[in-house]
Amino acid sequence: MSAFVRVVPRISRSSVLTRSLRLQLRCYASYPEHTIIGMPALSPTMTQGNLAAWTKKEGDQLSPGEVIAEIETDKAQMDFEFQEDGYLAKILVPEGTKDIPVNKPIAVYVEDKADVPAFKDFKLEDSGSDSKTSTKAQPAEPQAEKKQEAPAEETKTSAPEAKKSDVAAPQGRIFASPLAKTIALEKGISLKDVHGTGPRGRITKADIESYLEKSSKQSSQTSGAAAATPAAATSSTTAGSAPSPSSTASYEDVPISTMRSIIGERLLQSTQGIPSYIVSSKISISKLLKLRQSLNATANDKYKLSINDLLVKAITVAAKRVPDANAYWLPNENVIRKFKNVDVSVAVATPTGLLTPIVKNCEAKGLSQISNEIKELVKRARINKLAPEEFQGGTICISNMGMNNAVNMFTSIINPPQSTILAIATVERVAVEDAAAENGFSFDNQVTITGTFDHRTIDGAKGAEFMKELKTVIENPLEMLL
C-alpha cells in the first residue's frame, strides 16, 4: 500500500512561531496526524542557535504560552514559548545540541494524547523532506489540499522502523539557576553530569564550580600519570592532532561558545572593515561629582545616580549637538543615516561575554529614568534574560572601565553599523594650577575619555567637535538640563 503525504501550511498565533517552520504531515499508512516543531527564530538576525534545555519531556501536555525549551542565541538565552494545545510526542534534538539552523525540526507534537506512543521510534528523517528544505514563509491564504502518491521504493521508509531512535530523549526537566546554566554553557558542561544541592535538586553556581574543581583535579591526576610514563605518552601521539605542549605544560581547552564566536566575528569585521580613528580628552568631572552627590542626597531612595548614568546623559546632549556622531554607515542602501533619537548602548561584562543593552530615547528621559533603566538592563544582561530588541541596535555606545583604578586610558572597537564609541577610564586626582590656592595649585578629579570614530561617517574635525561638546557638558553639567 502506497503512502500519501498531505502537507498543510499552518499559520502560528505567535510572533516566535511565525518565524519558524511548522508543517503538519499526515502519513496515512504510518503515523497519526502530527505537527513538526521547527527551530524558532527568536530575533530578526538569528540564523541558528543552541538548544540549551528542554523544559518539557515526551508525553507532557502543552498549553499556549508555556515554555517548552530554552534557546541560546548569539547573545542571550531565551525561553521558547509554545502557542498551541497538545502533547509533546517526540523530541528530535537533544538538549545541549549546538548550531541548529532556524526551521530545522526539533520536536513533534500531537493533539491527542493517545497518539503519543506511536512516535516512540520516530526519527528526524521521518519528518519528511519538505519540512527540512522549505525556508519560505507559508502564505496566509488557504491552499487546496494536494495528495501526492509516493514512489513504491519509498513506501518502506514511511513506516516507523523497529530499531531504536538515535536521539535519546531527556529523562525529565533539570532545574538550574540562570547563572548556573550560563556558566555551564560557557564551559561546555552537561547539566546532566552535575549534582544539584539546591531545593528540589536545583543546580546552583556553587554546584557548577564544585564540578569544575573536581574535573580539574581528575585532569591533573591523569596528566600526572601520563608524565610518569613518557614512553606510553609518546606512543599515543597521533598524526594530525594539535601540537603537543611540553610534558610540564598545564592548560585547559575551553569550547568556543556561540556568543564568543559571534563577538569575535563582529569585532574582526569592525577592525578590518572600518577606517577608524581616535580622539582623547582629559575632562574634569569635579562639578559632575558634586551634582551627583547633591541629587542623591535628596533622592529619598527613588534613585541612586552613578557617574555612568550622568555620562550617558552627557553623551546624549553632545550627540544631539553633533549628529554626525549619532549615525549609521549603510553602504548597501548607499546612505549615512543620522538619527534624531539617541539610543545609547551600554557595554556590560557578563559571565559569557560582552553585551550592550540599549537605553532608548535618552534625549527624552531624565537622569532618574536613565539610571533606573540601566540598572534593570544590566541586571538582566548578567543572567542572559534580555530580549533581542534590548541589545540589538543602538545609535552610539559607551564602554566604562572606570571601576578599575588601573585603567587610566583605553580605546574601544566600534560596534557596526554605529559610528562612535566612547571609552571611559578611571577617575584620577590631578594637581592643577590655581592662583587662588595658598600653594598655587589645587587637586581636580579628571577622567580620560577616548572616542573611536568611523571616518566614513564622521570626519576628524567633526570627531574633535563632538569631544569638545562632550567636555563642555561634563565640565558644566547643568547644561544637561537645557
Curated annotation (Swiss-Prot):
Species the sequence originates in: Saccharomyces cerevisiae (strain ATCC 204508 / S288c) (Baker's yeast)
Further information: The E2 component contains covalently-bound lipoyl cofactors and it participates in the generation of acetyl groups from hydroxyethyl-thiamine pyrophosphate-E1 and their transfer to coenzyme A. Present with 5440 molecules/cell in log phase SD medium.
One GO-annotated biological process of the protein: pyruvate decarboxylation to acetyl-CoA
Entry's cofactor comment: Binds 1 lipoyl cofactor covalently.
InterPro entries tied to this protein: 2-oxoA_DH_lipoyl-BS, 2-oxoacid_DH_actylTfrase, Biotin_lipoyl, CAT-like_dom_sf, E2/Pdx1, E3-bd_dom_sf, LAT1, PSBD
Subcellular location: Mitochondrion matrix
Gene: LAT1
UniProt-annotated stretches for the region Disordered: 122-170, 214-251
Extent of Low complexity compositional bias: 217-250
N6-lipoyllysine, modified sites: 75
SUPFAM superfamilies attached to this UniProt entry: CoA-dependent acyltransferases (SSF52777), Peripheral subunit-binding domain of 2-oxo acid dehydrogenase complex (SSF47005), Single hybrid motif (SSF51230)
Biased segments, Basic and acidic residues type: 143-166
Enzymatic reactions: N(6)-[(R)-dihydrolipoyl]-L-lysyl-[protein] + acetyl-CoA = N(6)-[(R)-S(8)-acetyldihydrolipoyl]-L-lysyl-[protein] + CoA
All residue ranges annotated as the Lipoyl-binding domain in the record: 34-110
Function, as annotated: The pyruvate dehydrogenase complex catalyzes the overall conversion of pyruvate to acetyl-CoA and CO(2).
Domain Peripheral subunit-binding (PSBD): 175-212
Active-site residues from the entry: 455, 459
Keyword entries, A-Z: Acyltransferase, Lipoyl, Mitochondrion, Transferase, Transit peptide
Subunit-level organization: Eukaryotic pyruvate dehydrogenase (PDH) complexes are organized as a core consisting of the oligomeric dihydrolipoamide acetyl-transferase (E2), around which are arranged multiple copies of pyruvate dehydrogenase (E1), dihydrolipoamide dehydrogenase (E3) and protein X (E3BP) bound by non-covalent bonds.
Transit peptide location: 1-28
Protein name: Dihydrolipoyllysine-residue acetyltransferase component of pyruvate dehydrogenase complex, mitochondrial
GO cellular component: mitochondrial matrix; mitochondrion; pyruvate dehydrogenase complex
PANTHER family: DIHYDROLIPOAMIDE ACETYL/SUCCINYL-TRANSFERASE-RELATED, DIHYDROLIPOYLLYSINE-RESIDUE ACETYLTRANSFERASE COMPONENT OF PYRUVATE DEHYDROGENASE COMPLEX, MITOCHONDRIAL-RELATED
Transmembrane segments: none
Gene Ontology molecular functions: dihydrolipoyllysine-residue acetyltransferase activity
